[in-house]
Amino acid sequence: MLDSFKENEALRKYLFSGHFGLEKENIRVTSDGKLALTPHPAIFGPKEDNPYIKTDFSESQIEMITPVTDSIDAVYEWLENLHNIVSLRAENELLWPSSNPPILPAEEDIPIAEYKTPDSPDRKYREHLAKGYGKKIQLLSGIHYNFSFPEALIDGLYAEISHPNESKRDFKNRLYLKVAKYFMKNRWLLIYLTGASPVYLADFTKTNSEEVLNDGSKALHRGISLRNSNAGYKNKESLFVDYNSFDAYISSISNYIEAGKIESMREFYNPIRLKNAHTDQTVESLAKHGVEYLEIRSIDLNPLEPNGISKDELIFIHLFLIKGLLSEDRELCANNQQLADENENNIALNGLAQPAIKNCDNEEMSLADAGLLELDKMSDFIQSLIPNDNHFQAIIEKQKERLLHPEKTIAAQVQAQSAKEGYVEFHLNQAKTYMEETEALAYKLVGAEDMELSTQIIWKDAIARGIKVDVLDRAENFLRFQKGDHVEYVKQASKTSKDNYVSVLMMENKVVTKLVLAEHGIRVPFGDSFSDQALALEAFSLFEDKQIVVKPKSTNYGWGISIFKNKFTLEDYQEALNIAFSYDSSVIIEEFIPGDEFRFLVINDKVEAVLKRVPANVTGDGIHTVRQLVEEKNTDPLRGTDHLKPLEKIRTGPEETLMLSMQNLSWDSIPKAEEIIYLRENSNVSTGGDSIDYTEEMDDYFKEIAIRATQVLDAKICGVDIIVPRETIDRDKHAIIELNFNPAMHMHCFPYQGEKKKIGDKILDFLFE
């Protein structure tokens, strides 16, 4: 078969691609490493309805399922995002990073997963497993790796090497059977290289190859993977199926079901299973539709990786499957399966001692030699098909290092750290470290960092609920959300089907906004608008002795605004006009209202968040210049540009320069220690300001004003900016200075100070409930 790829460049390009899907199980634990007995987090909804986040056997055993993707990069991004979403939503709990369980309660207190009804087929199946195998063993967790070859690859091979009169369906079945046979024979190598469960608690199980560690936990003596050993999660007896043909494979599984050895194909716990994409996962469905993908079930959670597996491990498993496709198709009889099982168990229990491997002729070869033989073959076919590759070869070289140096295996490192820190402490420390890393980047959706932060937030919140998300226009942050038959289109996180078009037009035009609000008795600053810069300049005498604001008529995010609270010159006024007219063809000059500026986020006639916005500023140290202080403050990892991070970097543009000049300062001025220098007069977070949550502290009087303003304009998702007087006695001197039809949500979700609000959830509630 290798020759087919050497001679056919069009076919060769498909060999190293494919379709990938991952399923990952983690136990939810308390901060002291005990099984969490809390219900599955409600935000994820019923397990039956969420395609991404479910439970495995136990209510405490969360399962993350990626959609099918066309690359390992994409499936890994999905896995990382799901892991982060689940970690952040499992409040006050951690995700246990080991395949082997944490501290468990009594058997009868381990909760089986709950479903909508007590007689749910999923619930009944789990009750059957609990009765037949016990609950504790069900808590062994791992990763399932789902893979299929590209259809174009199968079509090309079918045209070149299919048997006479063989249908494409039969050819496809035969192809996947061949790969499965290779996997079954050589899975010992994968277990040696990826196994990561050599340590376990003393009361979990007992093996014939164990030693007691200092903390009382147990470790397999020179072992690799408890989960993949005979003491792991296996069928009660070995089930050898017939791999000679697809029909024989189906018949042998059917016979085991009829004999009562297993209840259904779901209970066929082979390390690799032939599957199709139909939800009816029965042997009859597989026989009818044929093989569509392979499910690899023997991968341990890697406690050394935040997401339980590395991207290079995923790539290596892919190469392993390609090797199976290119290998000679050999018989896998019951005797050979018995030998393969023995190799698997021997490596799982004693792999670090590097026991000999038996081939199908019952001949022995050292583990290192047998492993290097397979890895060299991988290296050879990669070299012959993609001679300029470096990445794949580097991954294979790393596996060779693990064969030659057992101490470099994942299992050896896990065992060493567990012996040093204790089984529970080591895995708890890993879980806490990963949680801290997740929390530090809680605002981010991996793979969507180029999109607005508010879009990333609502996208993540949609995934948590099992809502399907399609990107319609990446540059425009335009998404489609779908839950069942319900579809919603959302742009920039807050432009939705609930918007009234004329309301948007009114809010976009600040003159119209003020006029309509004033007509309804809502206080707004008085002022004038100008479309001619020369006329605006001539009006200087009307404003020179007043406190004023100069701003574009139709802009957002606080851009182009200048505020004069003190005496200003004609030159200052002219520069403010230049700035404002650079953003719009019309500007507004209005009175300055003293007080503090607050953003009220109103969703469907309810104030969901209130934020105090402090203008962009730096604090002096008596040593550094203003410019240097800005540069230092901008190094905060939470500050970015274009709304890609929770806080915006402070700019050094004309607005900031003007503000400094009004204070008789320049960029080279050195402020005194603890002296606060403001770089902007307006307090918009989008111009580098700091955000402080005030939702609970804000007087309901002003919340009602914000709601009334949105009702006047019939705005359903709206940011209302209100200047609130500092003295309660002056509260009637407030003023609404702006209504925003596309309010940013990220500053409420990740404020500089104060409580984080789940605004994405609030918008999704509004759209879908």
From Swiss-Prot:
Question: Record-annotated residues binding ATP?
Answer: 541-599
Transmembrane in keyword set: no
Question: Any idea which UniProt keywords this protein has?
Answer: ATP-binding, Glutathione biosynthesis, Ligase, Magnesium, Manganese, Metal-binding, Multifunctional enzyme, Nucleotide-binding
Catalytic EC class: ligase
Q: Which cofactor does it need?
A: Mg(2+); Mn(2+)
Q: Which reaction does it catalyse?
A: L-cysteine + L-glutamate + ATP = gamma-L-glutamyl-L-cysteine + ADP + phosphate + H(+); gamma-L-glutamyl-L-cysteine + glycine + ATP = glutathione + ADP + phosphate + H(+)
Q: Which GO terms describe its molecular function?
A: ATP binding; glutamate-cysteine ligase activity; glutathione synthase activity; metal ion binding
The question of whether Ligase is a record keyword is answered with yes
| Record-linked InterPro entries | ATP-grasp, ATP_grasp_subdomain_1, Gln_synth/guanido_kin_cat_dom, Glu_cys_ligase, Glut_biosynth, Glut_cys_ligase, GshAB_ATP-grasp, PRibGlycinamid_synth_ATP-grasp
- Report the pathway entry: Sulfur metabolism; glutathione biosynthesis; glutathione from L-cysteine and L-glutamate: step 1/2; Sulfur metabolism; glutathione biosynthesis; glutathione from L-cysteine and L-glutamate: step 2/2
Q: Which Pfam families match?
A: ATP-grasp_6, GARS_A, Glu_cys_ligase
Q: At which positions is Mn(2+) 1 bound? A: 721, 738
Record's GO cellular component, any one?
cytosol
Q: What task does this protein carry out?
A: Synthesizes glutathione from L-glutamate and L-cysteine via gamma-L-glutamyl-L-cysteine.
| Family label | In the N-terminal section; belongs to the glutamate--cysteine ligase type 1 family. Type 2 subfamily.
Q: How does it assemble?
A: Monomer.
What is the name attached to this protein's record? Glutathione biosynthesis bifunctional protein GshAB
**Gene name, please?**
gshAB
